[in-house]
Every structure is written in C-alpha cells, then in structure tokens.
Amino acid sequence: MYRLLALVALASMADCSALLTHITGTSIPGQLFINRQFLAVNPDGAVYGTIESDNVDTIFKRVAVDRNRIVIQNAITCVYLCMDRCGQLYGSKTLSKDCFMREFLEKNNYNTYYKVYDRKLTYVALKNDGTPRKLQISKSRKLGKLSVYAMALLKRLSFPIYTSCPNIKSEIIVRHRKCHV
C-alpha cells in the first residue's frame, strides 16, 4: 500500500516538474532584450545593443550572489556587466563592487536591473541607437515613460551552453572604476 502511494506521489511530482520547466534558476544562460535590442558586452569592455540574436556577446548568465544582489556575466567570454557611480555601463573581466546589481520583476513581467547610489536608482538602459543610456532617478520617483529604455525581457536559450567561467565568489573587491563627472 505504501509503495503504491509512494509511486503515485513520484509520478505526480514528475508531472508537476514538467509543467514548471519555465521556472528556472538564475544561472541559466539567456539574452537580455532591452529597448528592441539585445544587450551585449564585448571582451574589451564595451557595452552596446544589437539586433543580431546570434552574437556571442549577447549570451549572459545571471547569478544570484545573495538575496538582494545578482551578477550578470557573459557566458562565453566571462566578462561581467558593471555600472559605475555615474551610471556608465562597462564590462570587466574582474569582479568588483560595480558588478553587483539588483533585479526587480515589474508588474508587466519585465525585469529591471539597477544599482542604488546616494538615494538614487541607476538602471541598466539602452538608447534607441544601441548605446548605453545613463538613467538615474530618485528613489521616490517611478520610471514612467523612461521605462522604455530600462525594461528587460529575458530570452532563455533553447540550446545548452557549457562555460569555462570560474565560480563567482561573494567577496567584494574594491570599486573597480572611478567616476569622472
């Protein structure tokens, strides 16, 4: 009797897990689609937007470091997406304070990626031409019409990616880049 109940429970769990395949962890590779283009980071650190979905610079993995912070890393070149205090986006091969971001799931199922500096939210955003946009608003304001530049969709890859990137350690390195105002 107990074996039959255990068998039925296992079968129902297998059915449920098949229905929940869209819910996956943060380290699954994918592409971030922001403002009608894919976010890309060159190995030399340049951040840009492209419409080419087969570009290797657009394949990222989001890794949860702790409850409130994630790191966005290129799954092929192992370059981290970072943002300095001025809101400038850049890529870095070394992990620093600038590379830790927050992710927020909006009501419309889009994600926003941001950092908090001096009571201001600084978002990962792209202009219409694909260049990074500095988008910084106070904590009390809503994104509103500026959300076009910062709302991101995560497109999961339909094929497996095997990376040779080292594991991310949660220790924080000093700020990587000085902000020049």
UniProtKB/Swiss-Prot annotation:
Pfam families the record matches:
FGF
The residue range of the signal peptide is 1-16
Q: Which cysteines are joined by disulfide bonds?
A: none
| Keyword Signal included in the entry's annotation | yes
- Alphabetized GO MF terms: growth factor activity
Give the InterPro entries listed for this entry.
Fibroblast_GF_fam (IPR002209), IL1/FGF (IPR008996)
Name under which the protein is recorded:
Fibroblast growth factor homolog
Q: Which UniProt keywords apply?
A: Growth factor, Signal
Family, similarity comment? Belongs to the heparin-binding growth factors family.
